[in-house]
Amino acid sequence: MLCNKRVRANVSQYYLLNMQDIPSLEEFRTQAATFIAAAVRSNDACPAYGAILPPHLHEPAMHWQRFCFEEGWAGVHWPQEYGGMGLTPAHNVVWHEECAIAEVAPYLNLQGLVLAGEAILRSGTPQQRERFLRPTLRNEILWCQLFSEPGAGSDLAGLQTSAVADGDQFLLNGQKVWSSNAQFAQFGILMARTNSDQPKHKGISFFLLDMTLEGIEVRPIKQMTGDSEFCEVFFTDVSMPSDSLLGEVNEGWGVAMAVLEDERGGAGAAGVISLGKRLETMAEKSTALDDVRTEKLTGILNRGKALQALMERRGGDPLIAPVAKLMNSELGYSEAQLNSLLQGAEAMLHSDTTENLLYSPGMRIAGGSSEIQRNIIGERILGLPREPQPSE
């Protein structure tokens, strides 16, 4: 990617943090905004995108992640020994907010930086942390998530993919589905059953799977958007080395639940900032913004502000994760529907609008369906009776 070398050099000279003194959030906000602005001017920053990474932004996103690492701005709250900045989760929230304000992507690979990386930081051995964390930040390893199965999506504990211990390795067999970008990933975070005699939530282990191992077949799934973001993955007698195990054998459920909390609870002010900017753009472009449509637009923004306030008050509370996931999914769906409504027939002439509209129903399914999130909220937060299962 072409860039202004003088501006790029100034990024390192003036804007890197002195990590001997952890800056206050406001100091860090100023530093982050300055760094991002310089990166935008030098064409090193990748423009923000929604749930889908468009093909034309793949290389810019790859470059932006590497650039942030080289300039010392990757992994805001990761330990310095693994290439991070050694700051706090609150500083990481500020980074996301400033990226949203500048309409810049905060990172490339959610599965790697948010899901796999955080899991390895929490549960990994020193060897696993050394092997995976820095290369992931440096964008040398892309990750995918291998959780859902044809018969175990919402009921994840019903998974059947097996990993049988065999000497110094595990023999992996089974199938996963709806794995984002598995066709590009070098590694995947995998849940597999290691003890079929134990109850559903037990007997499951968590693995860091090398996607280049023999016996792995990845088949991209054609979506109605025309893209193939999701894949189904088949495992036939795949020999995984024993050091692929993350955490203890048969104790993977707890590791996985923490990962899902990371995935579902990542919303906050940054998402609301991005939402507000997109709604503002909608209003500017619309030629039919009557009272009814204005009410719909402000209603979406107000719901976003409510989510932001909730996250600010209860941030870090794992019980908030399903609430955040549900609200984000519904906001994304409502936004896509409204954008199409405001543009009318012209919406079909704009590829981004059409793609978002076609993708929007999936927002209520991916990462845990809205129905499942409502069940979790009802049972775990509100204390309502458990929903009967079909077998009961």
Where would I find each of the regions flagged by the language model?
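A short, Trp-centered hydrophobic/proline-enriched beta-strand micro-motif
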Residues: N139-F147, M191
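Amphipathic, small/basic residue-rich leader segments at the start of a protein or domain
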Residues: N4, A9-L110, R131-P135, D290-T298, ...
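Glycine-rich phosphate/cofactor-binding loops in nucleotide/flavin-utilizing enzymes
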Residues: D21, A90, V94-W95, C99, ...
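A structural signal for short hydrophobic beta-strand segments in well-ordered beta-sheet cores
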Residues: T161-V164
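A short core secondary-structure module
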Residues: Q169, N173-R219
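Glycine-rich phosphate/pyrophosphate-binding beta-alpha loops
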Residues: A152, V177-Q183, M224-T225, G362-S369
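Internal helix-loop-helix
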Residues: M62-Q65, F69-E140, N181-F187, G304, ...
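Glycine-rich beta->alpha junctions and the first turn(s) of the following alpha-helix
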Residues: D21-P23, I216-L307, M363
